[in-house]
């Protein structure tokens, strides 16, 4: 009886651990940007967060730009256009903070591992058209947003500038709203995942 109880507890713990890992990143593997931020705090955290979120937004913009030519759905095109506009505004704001708070400029590549992952995502989207594009885009972009939401959650806890905390909270909410929209479209057009 004791062994059965222990095995049940081990199985339950395994399920909880696996589900937390999956919730951490829906793709199942750790996000390189979030992992690199976890041990940082104070000014070092803020600089790294800003640098990496700028890189993250740039990669999201590149993915969204593909939608203007590769989907037939006006809703996806409009969604991508709005996303590009809002993320360009956020990049400008984060770049100003980097300059005024830390006398730094955005790096072209703040996280090489994330850059490599983005190139893989772009290769999966390139060449896809219409429904094939939409299906991949509506799978990958929510995962991309999920990583940004997790980065924002860290910033809400660890940032030292209150305006960065507020900015991160708003960005997380906006990206969660966009994730819901994309998941609704994916389910409506392609069925349950």
Spans of model-derived segments:
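Bacterial N-terminal signal peptides that target proteins for export
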Residues: 1-8
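Bacterial N-terminal signal peptides
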Residues: 8-16
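Sec/Tat signal peptide C-region and signal peptidase I cleavage site
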Residues: 17-23
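All-alpha RGS (Regulator of G-protein Signaling) helical domain and cognate RGS-like helical scaffolds
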Residues: 24-193
